[in-house]
Amino acid sequence: MHDPSELLEDGPAAVRRLARRRYDLDLAALEKAVRRRSEAQAEVTRLRTELNRTSRARGRSGPPSEEEKEAARALRADVQQAEATARTAGHDLTELLLGIPNVPLDSVPDGDTDQEAVEVRRWGRPPHDAGTDARHHSDIGESLGILDGPAAAKLSGSRFSVGRGAGARLERALADFFLDLHTGEHGYTEYSVPFLVNRDTMTGTGQLPKFEDDLFRTQVGDRELFLIPTAEVPLTNLVAQQLLDARALPYAFTARTPCFRAEAGAYGRDTRGILRLHQFEKVELVRVCAPEDAPAQLELMVGHAEECLRRLELSYRVVQLPAGDLGFSARMTYDIEVWLPGSDAYREISSVSDCGTFQARRADIRHKRADGRKAPAATLNGSALPIGRTVAALLEQGVREDGSVLLPEALVPYTGFRRILPGGATA
């Protein structure tokens, strides 16, 4: 969420920056909402002052008359009405601000889609010459007997998956490998968090109110909860409504959770395989820091996600997203795209985003500086990594001419095997 005074002060510059992400900022509506709230708050202050003044005056002049009692009752009613008006004005301003996305950094390139992302670097090379025919991961997994799409469809419908035998073991191994790397070498603290959260928690990280159609919601009686679309939501909100000691920053959190997404805008896309599911597992990274440290923290987190892929010997590239393709809460994002021979393309496997103070203002995450000033902190988040997409990449990059899949050496301590053979046997 934004500080409205900053948006109004920036004026046309704020309009221009938000237009880069195809958002039309209505300065006149914002100014009207701010003025309405200010005037309502001023009226509350005026009436309370008047009520206090008359109360003190009556106390000095003896018992009040019936006329004075009636005047006092009327004044108290006016105060209550003014307070209600101020609450409404404040609510209306908050609702307006909650719908305004983060402002892209000036260094973010122009453009509207991931096709206009700017490549930053590559690691490895697309294994066209690996001596194998390019095959889609769903074909590989089903031929090995480790992915069962029909079973998933029978249980839950489209966009779900079932892993079996060595496939399920591989998923568990990847999650443990990622968590061990992040906690043992990258300095993150692991958390076990709820998968169901309330509306305030979803609002704090920016999923609500704008993206309610993309979320799975539960309702039991009058209790409403949402299934998390990413562990970013509970991890970031661990420090919601808190004043943090700047000397303790940065905080670094990680968690492995299932993620639930309705994928309302993805009709017809990636209907085969395990790239785009309603439910998938992911290891998430979240960092909370002083705002001036956010750029360096972003680069650090990208490096942590890249290290996962390098240890797994998976070819990938890093791209910077254009302004029009940024997530609602992000002011800058790097996507890491892994090479998928079966698609003959790089596909996103991680997004790492700098949200600046945007989420912190929504969730009331502040830090106390050395000089005593209290100010919003900065938040960052990134995938490192989603389990299903990593499995897809390992299958497509690791398949051999005999139909077996060779896994990276780094996973052997976690899987207990290096190769998955046709029929699901391991070696």
From Swiss-Prot:
Biased composition (Basic and acidic residues): 35-53
GO molecular function: ATP binding; serine-tRNA ligase activity
Disulfide bond residue pairs: none
The UniProt record lists the keyword rRNA-binding: no
CDD domains: SerRS_core (cd00770)
Region feature Disordered, mapped onto this chain: 35-72
Pathway involvement of the protein, from the record: Aminoacyl-tRNA biosynthesis; selenocysteinyl-tRNA(Sec) biosynthesis; L-seryl-tRNA(Sec) from L-serine and tRNA(Sec): step 1/1
Binding site for L-serine: 230-232, 284, 383
Catalyzed reaction equations: tRNA(Ser) + L-serine + ATP = L-seryl-tRNA(Ser) + AMP + diphosphate + H(+); tRNA(Sec) + L-serine + ATP = L-seryl-tRNA(Sec) + AMP + diphosphate + H(+)
Subcellular location(s) of the protein: Cytoplasm
Job description of the protein: Catalyzes the attachment of serine to tRNA(Ser). Is also able to aminoacylate tRNA(Sec) with serine, to form the misacylated tRNA L-seryl-tRNA(Sec), which will be further converted into selenocysteinyl-tRNA(Sec).
Assembly and oligomerization: Homodimer. The tRNA molecule binds across the dimer.
Notes on the domains: Consists of two distinct domains, a catalytic core and a N-terminal extension that is involved in tRNA binding.
Family: Belongs to the class-II aminoacyl-tRNA synthetase family. Type-1 seryl-tRNA synthetase subfamily.
Name this protein carries in UniProt: Serine--tRNA ligase 2
Species, as recorded: Streptomyces avermitilis (strain ATCC 31267 / DSM 46492 / JCM 5070 / NBRC 14893 / NCIMB 12804 / NRRL 8165 / MA-4680)
Name of the coding gene: serS2
